[in-house]
């Protein structure tokens, strides 16, 4: 064991050296982010200047304005440090809607769009159809009794906490009295107390206490159906009660140990980030200071689909899948820790790294990213002091390399460009994800088609 610890310490030391050598590249990326923000701000000024000239420019502004604001207001802690993993909790709430609660379906809806799912099209909008899914919002073990976790979902603020029975619950993060964020208060005996006037709310959203005044019954805030499963807290923001429980694909595979669970708020539209995660052809060009450092440029990169939304990469030993509505799973075959086995399938390798990415649409132009990393070897390594800090640092460097690119794409889309003007064969999985999004936008995606290929899927061209 001592020799293993010494070996791991050497590898950690080597990893730290590599991270230090990437500082210049990260600084360049941050400078480019600043330039892209300035360019996006310039585009917004141009849009505002021309908004009164024609009706068409007004229409464009309504589609892009919110995304421009998101791009031009990147917080300093995001732009200067790449990513900051925020340790927050996770919870579980009632699956019924109380009578006093306004339903999520009462939110303002956009008008219908022409149905054309076969054509690829980029979008920065959050389609209404995306609401009718279960969403992982936080890692369950990070929600301790007495803790609150605020988050946004489809532009609505919510807060997670554990009720008097330690069951996770989710209510709107806005007091029914004066709209003060409830997450600024505290949890008392499983109820959230507003810090403004002391009103208290239970897990169903009902107000249970109004100090210093006569109690008004029937007052409350909205609540979402919420369950805890596979180490995540899931919520249902859709229309009416959920039809079933969350899916079964998020648990770590048998024989794997979880080594890292990281949450990051990213100032990028969740679909752009998902398409980036579903693309490996960019790795040797983008991730030159992290995991793909030293990778040779392949003569050809291919994705061999084994299912409609899953398959294997060639020549990389990586299997990957997209799982509606916003989850990417990947298994990477390793010859040794940190080294891939080119020319093999992941299943043919002896060691594996399993990744789960959740790209939750927090609001237009912003994503709540949940990342879980598991290994089927080195189970003892998760007990090494501060090793989680190393994993988070590495994950931050990788995301930083991607962030400058997807922020650039987002700025171009705001200016009217299309990210799918020239798709290539190695874009197959990302293309299929985008066609799925197009189906959701057009109202063509059926709940029963989630786990099987439909005739609509079968008719999709890949490029």
From Swiss-Prot:
It catalyses: chlorophyllide a + 2 NADPH + 2 O2 + 2 H(+) = chlorophyllide b + 2 NADP(+) + 3 H2O. Residues 113-122 have a biased composition (Basic and acidic residues). One of its GO terms (biological process) is chlorophyll biosynthetic process. It is an enzyme of class 1 (oxidoreductase). Residues 1-20, 67-122 are annotated as: Disordered. It is a peripheral membrane protein. It is found in: Plastid, Chloroplast inner membrane; Plastid, Chloroplast thylakoid membrane. One of its GO terms (cellular component) is chloroplast inner membrane. Residues 134-235 form the Rieske domain. One of its GO terms (molecular function) is iron ion binding. [2Fe-2S] cluster binds at residues 175, 177, 194, 197. Residues 1-51 form a coiled coil. Fe cation binds at residues 275, 279, 282, 287. Keywords: 2Fe-2S, Chlorophyll biosynthesis, Chloroplast, Coiled coil, Iron, Iron-sulfur, Membrane, Metal-binding, NADP, Oxidoreductase, Plastid, Plastid inner membrane, Thylakoid, Transit peptide. PROSITE patterns: RIESKE. Its EC number is 1.14.13.122. Residues 92-106 have a biased composition (Polar residues). Catalyzes a two-step oxygenase reaction involved in the synthesis of chlorophyll b. Acts specifically on the non-esterified chlorophyllide a and not on chlorophyll a. This is Chlorophyllide a oxygenase, chloroplastic. It comes from Dunaliella salina.
């Amino acid at each position: 064991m001592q020799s293993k610890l010494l070996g791991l310490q050497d590898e950690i030391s080597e990893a730290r050296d590599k991270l230090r050598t990437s500082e210049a590249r990260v600084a360049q990326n941050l400078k480019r982010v600043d330039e892209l923000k300035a360019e996006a701000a310039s585009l917004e000024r141009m849009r505002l200047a021309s908004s009164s000239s024609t009706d068409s420019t007004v229409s464009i502004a309504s589609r892009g304005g919110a995304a421009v604001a998101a791009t031009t207001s990147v917080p300093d802690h995001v732009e200067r440090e790449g990513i900051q993993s925020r340790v927050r909790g996770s919870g579980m709430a009632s699956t019924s809607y109380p009578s006093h609660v306004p339903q999520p379906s009462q939110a303002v809806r956009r008008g219908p769009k022409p149905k054309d799912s076969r054509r690829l099209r980029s979008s920065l909008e959050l389609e209404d159809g995306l609401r009718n899914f279960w969403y992982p919002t936080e890692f369950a073990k990070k929600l301790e009794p007495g803790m609150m976790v605020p988050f946004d979902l489809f532009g609505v603020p919510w807060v997670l906490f554990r009720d008097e029975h330690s069951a996770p619950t989710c209510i709107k993060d806005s007091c029914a009295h004066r709209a003060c964020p409830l997450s600024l208060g505290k949890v008392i005996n499983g109820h959230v107390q507003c810090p403004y006037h002391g009103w208290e709310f239970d897990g169903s959203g009902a107000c249970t206490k109004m100090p210093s005044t006569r109690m008004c019954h029937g007052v409350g805030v909205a609540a979402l159906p919420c369950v805890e499963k596979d180490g995540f807290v899931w919520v249902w923001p859709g229309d009416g009660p959920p039809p079933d429980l969350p899916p079964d694909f998020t648990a770590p595979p048998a024989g794997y140990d979880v080594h890292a669970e990281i949450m990051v708020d990213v100032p990028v539209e969740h679909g752009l980030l998902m398409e980036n995660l579903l693309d490996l052809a960019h790795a040797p060009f983008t991730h030159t200071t992290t995991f793909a450092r030293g990778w040779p440029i392949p003569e050809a990169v291919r994705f061999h689909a084994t299912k409609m939304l899953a398959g294997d990469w060639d020549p990389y030993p990586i299997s990957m899948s997209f799982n509606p509505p916003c989850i990417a799973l990947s298994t990477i075959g390793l010859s040794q820790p940190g080294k891939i086995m080119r020319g093999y399938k992941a299943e043919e390798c002896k060691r594996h790294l399993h990744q789960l990415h959740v790209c939750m649409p927090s609001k237009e132009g912003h994503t709540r990213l949940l990342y879980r990393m598991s290994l089927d070897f080195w189970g003892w390594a998760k007990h090494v002091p501060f090793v989680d800090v190393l994993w988070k640092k590495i994950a931050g460097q990788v995301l930083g390399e991607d962030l400058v690119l997807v922020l650039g794409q987002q700025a171009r889309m705001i200016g009217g460009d299309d990210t799918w003007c020239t798709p290539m064969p190695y874009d197959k999985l990302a293309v299929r994800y985008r066609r799925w999004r197009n189906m959701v936008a057009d109202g063509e995606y059926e709940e029963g088609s989630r786990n099987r290929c439909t005739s609509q899927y079968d008719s999709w061209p890949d490029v």
